[in-house]
Amino acid sequence: MSRILLRGIQCHACRQNVIRSFVSASGVTITPPAIGSVSTFNPHLSGSFPTRRVELFSSKAKDDSSLAADSVSENSAAQEDSYPQENSQQHVPWYLQEELQEMAPHPMRQQQELPPLPENPPPILKVLLEYISADIGLDNLNLLDLRALDPPPALGANLIMIFGTARGVKHLNVSADRFCRWLRTTYKLRPDADGLLGRNELKIKLRRKARRAKLAKRAGSTLTQPDDGITTGWICVDVGIVEGGQLSKPEGVQKAGFVGFGTVVQGTRIVVQMMTEEKREEIDLESLWRQTLEENSMENQDLPKPQAEEPPQVVGFTHEPSTITTADFSHRISQTPPIRANYEQLRSISTSLHRLRDNRGPATDFVPTGTAAATKSAESNSSQVSLPSLFNYLSNLEPDKAIDELGQGVDDRTSTGFLQKFYEELARAAPQIASTQRLELMCTAILLQHSGYRKDNLFQAFKEHIVSNYPLPRALVLRLLDALLAFKADPNSNPPRLRLPSADMELALQLIENAALRGANIFHADFLIRVFLAVSYRTRVYAVKPENLHSAAITGNRIPVSIDEFESVQRIQTRLASIIRAAKVALGEKEYLDILRVHSNQGEYAKFWNAWGEVSLQGIHRGKSFYLFLFDLHAELGDWQQSRTTLLNCIPMMWREDPPIFFDAELAEAVSKCIALAYPDIDDRVQQNLPALIVKTWHRCRIAIQNQKMSERKERLIQAELGTLPEN
C-alpha cells in the first residue's frame, strides 16, 4: 500500500511529509536528505518513479519511541531554521529572476513640477500650487517673488505672482472658474478674475459664434471679426491678501526724500496668471517682471551714504568752494537732500536762500550758512536761477552771434565770456543739475548747427547721464530727440542730402529705447510724429528708376530720387501710421499739419486728402491755420491743376465749417495767390463778371485786403494825431 501511495504522490516534498508522518508514529528515525543535493529544477514527470532505491531508513533503530519522536522534532525544527538561510543562498536561474526595470520619467512630469517656495512663504502658497498643478492641471508653473519691489507695483505690495499654462481656451476658462470657486468655498476668499467668462456666458458666446459661422458658410463668406471676446487666452486671478509671508524690513530704513502716507499692508497678495501657451509666448510676461525686479534691485542696492554732518558753528561765517567730482555718489541717492537729524540746519538753509536771492554776488562772496552741506545746497539753488538766465540770454541773440558765444566746440570752456560764466555756475551746481544743463547746452548748439558740437558728443554725454542714474524727465528726452533728429536738406550737394543720415537715426532710436526703459510712454504723438518726420524727405521729391536717376531733371520744384529708396520710406511711414492707429495715439493740430506737409512733399495726394478728412473725424476744428497752410502750400507748389482742385473743393468747405471760416487779409492774400496760379486769366473773368465761384471769391479777397489796408491807415492817422496832443 505504501508503494501505491508513493506512486500517487509525485512531489518529493509531499512524499517526505507523508513518510515522516507514518514513521514518527512507529519510532523509526528518518535521515533528512541534504538540501544541496536536491535538484532545483523539476524532473520529467512520468507515471512511475525510477527503480533506483533510496535509502530512507537508518540501520540503527531505537527502541525508545519517545527519544525518536524528540529527535524527529529537533531535526524538523533545525531543518525549518536552516531553510530560509539556505533558500536565500541557493541559485536562481535567469528565467525565474525578477527584473527590476528602471521606470523612465514621464515626459509630462517635468511640466508638472512645482516651483520652489520663496523665503518666508505664506502658509496657503504650497496648497495653492498643489491645487493648481494637480486638480486644475496647469502646466509649466512658475513663481515670481515680487515682495522686494520698492515702490510696490500697481497690483499691490508684498506681491507673489504665479504663472501657469492651460491646454486651451476652454481649459483656461474652466480652470479659472474652478479655482475661484475653490478659493471661495475653502478659504472664504473673494478672488477677482479679470478676463474670465462665466459658465453660462461662455456657452452662450460659443453657441452664437457657431451660429454666425454657420450662417456665413451658407452665404459663402467667412467671419472676419478679429476679436470675438472668447479667445483672449489670458485670465488674471487676483487671489487677494492672505495671511503671513510679508517681508520684514528693518525699522528706519527709508529712502531719502521719501514722502508718503497710509498704513503698511499686512499679509501677502497672490496673483495667478493663467494663459494659453501661445499667449504666454507672445507677451512673455515673466521676462518683463524679471527685468523690472532686476532694475529695482539695482536701484535699491546699498550705495555709499553721506556721513553725518557736524553741528553748525555759532561764530563766524565761512565759505568753501565746491569740489564735486563725477565719482561723488553721495548726491545720487535722491533728487532731494537727505533729511537731517538737526532741524536747526533746515532753518539756516532757508535763511541763506533768502539772503542769496536778495544779495547775489560773485562766487567768492560769503554766504551765511551753518554747514558745508547747507552751503552746497544754497549754491545749487543759486545755479538753478543763473543757468536759465544764461540760456535766456543765448536764445535772444541772433543765430550767428549765438554760435560765436558757444566757442570752438565741446572742449572749449574759456574762449568767450558766456562759456566762462556758464562753466563757473556749472561747477557750483549739484552733479545732477550740472549734467542736465550740459546736455541742454549741447542741444542748443546742435540746433543752431554749430560745427564744433557733434551728435555723437551729445549721445556720449547722454550715456554718462544714464550711467550716473540721474533722472530723465520727459522734457529733456524730447529736447535730446530734437537735437539728434535735427537736419537741414541740401539739394545742391552731390549727391543731394534730402533725408536724415542713418547714423543719426540709430542714435535717436537708442535714445527712445533708453527712455522706454525709464518708463516713458513712447506710444505718444511727441515721439511717433518726430520719428515719422525723421524718416521722411525734407523737400519735394518724385521717384524715378535707378538707371534714370542721373539723367532726371528737377521738375516743378521736385527733386528726383531713386524709386527703391522712395518705396522704402513709404513702407516705414506705413508701419508708423499703423502703430499710431493701433495705439490710438491722439494727434493735434501741429501733428496733422506736419503729416500733410510730408505727403505733399512726396506727391502722395490721395494720402494727403485722407489725412485732411481724418482731422475733422478726430473732432479737431479745421480753423484758419489749416486753410492758410493749405493755400500757401499749393501756391508754393506751383501746380495749377492741384491748385484748381483745391480751390473748387475747399472754398465751399470753409463756409461749412463750424464755426465757418471767413476771409481776413492774411487768408485772402494766400487764396489770391492760389487763384492767380490756377486761373491766369482771372482779370478777364472779373471784367466779364462771370457768375462763377472763383470770380466771387476773388472779389471777396480784394475786399478783405482793402479793408485791412484802410484799417491800418486809420490806425496810423490816430497814432499821428495822438502824437501831436499835448502831454497832461
Curated annotation (Swiss-Prot):
Gene3D superfamilies: Beta Polymerase, domain 2. InterPro entries: Atp25, NT_sf. One of its GO terms (cellular component) is mitochondrial inner membrane. One of its GO terms (biological process) is mRNA stabilization. Keywords: Membrane, Mitochondrion, Mitochondrion inner membrane, Transit peptide. It is found in: Mitochondrion inner membrane. It is a peripheral membrane protein. Probable mitochondrial mRNA stabilization factor. Belongs to the ATP25 family. This is ATPase synthesis protein 25, mitochondrial. It comes from Paracoccidioides lutzii (strain ATCC MYA-826 / Pb01).
